[in-house]
Amino acid sequence: DKEHYFDPKKLSQHLTGYTGETCCTYNMLKLSRHLFCWTGDSSIADYYERALYNHILGQQDPETGMVTYFLPLLSGSHKLYSTKENSFWCCVGSGFENHAKYGEAIYYHNNQGIYVNLFIPSQVTWKEKGLTLLQETEFPKEETTRFTIRAEKPVRTTVYLRYPSWSKKAEVLVNGKKVAVKQKPGSYIAITRDWKDNDRISATYPMQIELEATPDNPNKVALLYGPLVLAGERGTEGMQAPAPFSNPAHYNDYYTYNFHVPADLRTSLKVDMKHP
């Protein structure tokens, strides 16, 4: 909040117009990649996915290509995007770098096998094994991702499919035959076999709507669908462009935190916690 870390157990007290600085998430993703290489912990991949889809993808204006400095979490608030000539923040520099990194962190490998961490259409070649993995999906618009193996000769190795913590009943098929999934959400589904050219894997991860409360206030919740944090479509009425750096006294100046998100709290989501 306001470019500073705070006690993570006091999240509900920091839902403002200055949350989610993009440079911070940029560096947290970089740190997460290193941590995963050291630990192989699937919870790190879960975090990476949530940050990637909810912050990095949400940072860019799909119409103009401009990007945000902050991602406001205040109910009823809206995002402010940079402009081509008057607004250039640190989050513009790292912001555009972010959007050149979608090919990172999808796959990892060690001596035991290859890890699939993200469900993004892509292709990876493991040269030492002579194996190529092609992934096809429209996730998160669909719950299924599909893989095709390319190999000049049979390769014995393990494919580790991330079993996200947000999915409860994963279904995996290899060449059309169901694989027994004994692992629990928040782990990896390990498939070890002699992989041949044109072998196919299909993994389906059902998504459902869930409520996630802040750690310090059970009455403040986020609404999620799978890894996606949902937000209402409110249109563009009342939105204003950010002020240029040369005018720090402007009403929406980021640099002195004088800007107040024009939040209409009447649009806040109200949930009956007894009957969610």
What are these regions (language model features)?
Residues 173-179, 226:
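Short strand-turn-strand beta-turns centered on an Asx-Gly dipeptide
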Residues 36-46, 153:
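Structural helix-adjacent loops and short alpha-helical linkers that scaffold large soluble proteins
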Residues 154-175:
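Beta-strand-rich binding/interaction modules
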Residues 188-190:
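Short, surface-exposed beta-strand/beta-hairpin micro-motifs centered on an aromatic residue
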Residues 45-54, 59-150, 184, 193, ...:
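C-terminal beta-rich recognition modules with glycine/proline-rich loops and embedded aromatic residues
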Residues 17-36, 92-102:
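Well-ordered alpha-helical segments within folded domains of soluble proteins
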Residues 1-25, 83-91:
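Solvent-exposed loop and edge beta-strand segments that line ligand/cofactor-binding
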